[in-house]
Every structure is written in C-alpha cells, then in structure tokens.
C-alpha cells in the first residue's frame, strides 16, 4: 500500500478500514480518515512516518532545527531512559503528592516511563542505572490547572493582531520554558493548543503534557467575544472574526449553536470544554457581575461533553454565576473569588471542583488605570483570601492554577509560592500535584495520557522533580529554576544538574 501522512489521524489509503476499531474509513476524494486515536493507530502512524522519504525528512529536520535552535524550539531532552534499563533514584526524601509529610527510607524505580516500585534502600534491581539525589527532596512534576498556552508569552496587542503562525511559534518557545520551570502538565483552558500538544507529544518541541480545551465557548458580548464594536452587527455571510478563525474563541447563542461549538472542540480533540459564564475584571464589554449563558445553554454544553465522557469548566466569579453553573452540571469553576460562603457550601455538596488562582494585590497584579477595573481587582484580591479559607473549611475539591496572560510566564513558579501564605508548604504543593492530578481525571476517556499524574506512586507516570530546598519549610525555592536539579517527564530527563 502507498501512504502519505497529512497529520495525526489523517492519511491517504488505497482502500480503507481502520485495523484498530475495524470500522470502514469514510472517503472524501482520496482522503480516508479515522478518529479512533487508539495506541495501535498511533503506532501505525509512527511507522508510516518512518517510511516517508527518510532523506527528505532528515534534511528537512536539520534545516528546521538549525533555523529555530536559537529560538528555543529544538527539543531540549537531556537523555531518554536507555531501552530496557530501569532507572533508580536513590538517597532522597520523598513528597508523594498526596501525603502531607516527607518520607525517608525509600527509593524510586522507573521503568518504561512509569514508576514501577518504591523499594527500600538497597532493594532495587542490580542492573538499574542509579541516580544519587544527594539527600534532596523528590516531588511530582507540577501541574497548572488554568493555563493558556497560546496567550502566556505575548502581549494582548500581539495576540490580537499578529499572524497566528507567530503566536504558535511563541507558544512553542514558552512550552519549553514552562517545562524548565518544573510544570510537567498544564490544563489549557482556552486557545488553539492542539498543534502544540501534538508537537510536544511527538518530541518535536520540549514542553509539558497538555490537556487542551480548544476554543473558549462564549455568548455574544461574553468574556470570550473579542470583536470590536465596529465589526457589529455580523451578517451570516461575513467571515469569522480573527479570534474565532484562529481558534481562540467560538461564539454561540442558543442551544443549537452551543451544541455545535462544543462538538467542534471535541472533534478537534478537546479533553474538556471551557465556557464563559460571567464577566472579567477588565473586560471592555462584559461587566464583572454579568451572567452569561442561560442554564439551558450551559446544559447543552454539559450534555455534549458528557456524551463524550468528559466535562465542562467555566470562567465565572460571582455567586449567581457559580450557582447557575452548578445547576447546569458544570464540574469545574475557574476563578470564583466572589463566591459567598453559601455558594462554597453548594460547591462542596455537589462535588464541584474549584481551580483557584492567587489573584492578590501584589507585584504580580495587573496594572489598571480605569477606576472600575481597579475596584473590581480589589474585590477579587479580597475574595482570593476568602476562597482559600472557605475551600478548606468546607472541604471543596480544589487545585492550583495561574491564568497567566499576555506575558509574565516566568512568574508561574512564584505564583505557587504564594499559596504558602494561606496553608502549609506541603499542603500548597499538594494542590499543584496530587489534587491537580485528580482534577484532570474528570476528562475520563478524553484524557490524552494514560496514567496517574501528580503523584509518585507505583504505576504513575514518571513525571518528577529533584529540588534544592526544604519543601517543609517553604516554597521560595520555586521562584528560581536553578533549584530544580532534575526534571523528568515520562521517564525522560529534560534537565539534570545533579
């Protein structure tokens, strides 16, 4: 047979049936495709790629790597685990992501990209390659549950005016920096992250695991409507606005449109769906207190996501907005700093997850001149302190996220250190490891990675960090990446300065 690869899941074939799901592959001209995404299909795709003109591929790769090496896009993996040889981390203290204590008298055995055992010292296999951690602490790779891959490293004006190709290249560069900050997984909650996810997973670009939501689904004049007033009204024959065409947002009004936009993101490979259910601090058109999407519209998104085994998360701050989300079946509240205590109790009673960002009145706060935005920012900062208190008081499931936009990605680790102002350092780390990993399991079968994340336990994916710093005493070491002595993702070392 003759094959020519176009992209993941799409290839030409003389006659087609997916040999994994055993379903006929529909024909559009010469293009046959299957979306089963099974390991067998992906393995076949890798073999197909290997059969493509190796000389052309190697020549092209050399040119591309040479062109972008200085830009940060060349893979920065230090060394993969040698085939079939286990790796044993020794002489360490362990924070496993769930237990709020450090453990001594344990080693970490890694095989096939996973943690295969936690043997006592001296009990690991003799053939294992040993890495002496020098008495340092080993923690799970960090997880940011509220990240925007495409928007984290560029200014707002660049995001809204530059060619989307430039934004993707900048996102690739930022992905490498994100991994070097110790964040081995991010939940992307809005933006065209599918291409970067594929590049990272295939080893083209170094970066974290990405759980993509795809385009933010927003009502007209909602928090994800990035049009200008001079583009209104839009007529049916008008081309899509820039943000929609680029995959930043998808506008939907009414149940049928919400269903369609949700299903489009699922078709692209979304692991969860993101909607906007309220306004923002500095939004130009949607007030902070505004309610967005009716309950019926929200439920349409929830139904479509549930039919695919996944869930909806929602940008929302106010009690009224959060309550509407919960009634509609939304599983994860993003922000929520203006919730009253009754609403927090409602979240706890319904098992709703809460992704809380440390929006505080400090050096990382956005600088506003508009009095309304300044006042709204003050309310959110005060609400952030209550959110941490009430979330723990009422035993809400919650996890750490940053929501860094338009530059400032270097503050990602520093943002996590702020949680130690409100709880013990290990409790704060738990929210960016074990708890965050549990939130990611809501994606069910749409999760792009098979295995537990955020924990150091038998069978978990081998994403971990070796740190210089006392994790029981504080988290200030997170602000300096030099304190991350080893960064491992899937058993592969992307940094080793031990």
Q: Which positions does each model-derived feature cover?
A:
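Active-site core of metal-dependent hydrolases
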Residues: 18-21, 34, 220, 275-386, ...
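His/Asp/Glu-enriched, well-ordered alpha-helical/loop segment
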Residues: 307, 380-470
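Divalent metal-dependent hydrolysis catalytic cores, especially in the metallo-beta-lactamase
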Residues: 170-196, 207-216, 270-283, 311, ...
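Histidine-rich, glycine-flanked metal-binding segment
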Residues: 73, 77-79, 85-87, 94, ...
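Metal-associated gating/positioning segment near the N- to mid-region
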Residues: 136-202, 220-229, 296, 328
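N-terminal secretory signal peptides
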Residues: 1-53, 67, 71
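C-terminal cap of metal-dependent C-N hydrolases
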Residues: 92, 445-447, 452-498
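N-terminal twin-arginine translocation
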Residues: 51-56, 65-85
């Amino acid at each position: 047979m003759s094959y020519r690869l176009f992209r993941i899941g799409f290839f030409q074939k003389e006659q087609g049936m997916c040999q994994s799901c055993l379903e006929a592959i529909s024909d559009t001209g010469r293009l046959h495709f299957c979306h089963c995404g099974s390991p067998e299909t992906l393995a076949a795709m890798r073999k197909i790629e290997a059969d493509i003109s190796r000389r052309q591929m190697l020549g092209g790769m050399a040119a591309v790597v040479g062109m972008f090496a200085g830009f940060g896009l060349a893979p920065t993996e230090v060394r993969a685990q040698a085939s079939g040889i286990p790796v044993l981390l020794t002489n360490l203290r362990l924070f496993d992501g769930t237990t709020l204590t450090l453990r001594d008298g344990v080693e970490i055995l890694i095989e096939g990209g996973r943690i295969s055992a936690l043997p006592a010292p001296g009990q690991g296999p003799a053939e294992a390659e040993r890495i002496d951690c020098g008495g340092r602490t080993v923690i799970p790779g960090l997880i940011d549950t509220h990240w925007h891959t495409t928007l984290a490293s560029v200014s707002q004006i660049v995001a809204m005016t530059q060619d989307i190709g430039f934004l993707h290249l900048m996102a690739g560069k930022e992905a490498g920096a994100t991994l070097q900050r110790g964040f081995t997984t991010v939940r992307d909650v809005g933006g065209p992250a599918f291409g970067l996810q594929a590049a990272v997973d295939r080893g083209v670009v170094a970066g974290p695991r990405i759980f993509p939501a795809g385009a933010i689904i927003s009502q007209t004049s909602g928090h994800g409507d990035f049009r200008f007033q001079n583009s209104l009204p839009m007529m049916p024959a008008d081309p899509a606005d820039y943000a929609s065409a680029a995959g930043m947002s998808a506008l939907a009004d009414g149940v049928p449109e919400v269903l369609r936009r949700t299903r489009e993101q699922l078709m692209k490979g979304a692991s969860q769906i993101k909607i906007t259910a309220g306004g923002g601090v500095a939004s130009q058109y949607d007030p902070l207190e505004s309610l967005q999407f009716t309950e019926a519209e929200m439920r349409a998104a929830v139904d479509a996501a549930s039919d695919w085994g996944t869930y909806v998360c929602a940008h929302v701050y106010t009690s009224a907005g959060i309550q509407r989300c919960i009634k509609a079946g939304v599983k994860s509240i993003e922000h929520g700093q203006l919730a009253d205590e009754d609403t927090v109790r409602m979240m706890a009673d319904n098992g709703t997850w809460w992704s809380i960002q440390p929006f505080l009145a400090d050096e990382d706060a956005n600088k506003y001149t508009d009095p309304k935005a300044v006042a709204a920012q003050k309310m959110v900062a005060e609400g952030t302190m209550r959110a941490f208190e009430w979330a723990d008081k009422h035993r809400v499931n919650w996890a750490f996220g940053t929501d860094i936009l338009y530059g400032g990605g270097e503050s990602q680790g520093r943002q996590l250190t702020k949680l130690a102002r409100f709880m013990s350092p290990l409790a704060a780390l738990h929210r960016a490891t074990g708890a965050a990993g549990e939130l990611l399991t809501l994606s069910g079968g749409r999760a792009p990675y098979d295995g537990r994340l955020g924990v150091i336990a038998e069978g978990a994916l081998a994403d971990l960090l070796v740190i210089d710093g006392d994790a029981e005493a504080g988290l200030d070491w997170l602000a300096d990446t030099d304190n991350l002595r080893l960064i491992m993702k899937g058993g592969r070392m992307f940094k080793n300065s031990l």
